[in-house]
Amino acid sequence: FQLGKRVPVEAPQGTIEVVEFFWYNCPHCNAFEPSLEAWQKRLPADVVLRRVPVGFRDEFVPQQRLFFTLQEMGLTDKLHARVFAAIHVERLDLSRGTTIASWIGQQGVDKEKFGAIYDSAEVGKRVREATQLQDAYGVAGVPALGVGGRFYTDGAMAGSMARVLQVVDYLLADVRSGK
């Protein structure tokens, strides 16, 4: 799907940004994560993957804050997959700040430092920007991917989540060729 207007990207000049829109509670996002991880490992140097937690409703905000706090603390690589596992395998409720704080402490993270960043204005700003980006791409469900600020695809459009990354690879070629 080609967007009617270009969406701003954060990727450095000379690179193409792919945005994954996700929600930690989404079982489809959880199932897609291993495929996305494998795809990310083989990305060419001119492609940058950015993960963006969606905020369809107010209930999504604690997990948006969780993601951006992990990112701010440099813990995304260590804990991103663990958040999915905590929710989908261990069946923990990580939908509120209090339960998130309890879980984060069990991961060996300084709860006070985490809490200060979680409640910070900077994380609040990033949550708002994420929701604005999701709206600019017209995200209706997750997981979904934006490509180069010009294209958008998801499992329904591609026929399955298994085909989404093939579609993204095709769209990357289009962006590179200037189409």
Role assignments for model-derived ranges:
Residues 13-15, 63, 141-142:
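A structure-centric signal for secondary-structure junctions around beta-strands
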Residues 25-28, 55-59, 85-90, 122-123, ...:
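Solvent-exposed loop/turn segments at secondary-structure junctions
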Residues 1-58, 131, 173-179:
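Extracytoplasmic thiol/disulfide redox context detector
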Residues 42-73, 77-105:
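Structural microenvironment flanking redox-active thiols in thiol-disulfide oxidoreductases
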Residues 30-33, 60-64, 158-161:
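Conserved strand-to-helix beginnings and helix N-cap segments that scaffold or border functional pockets
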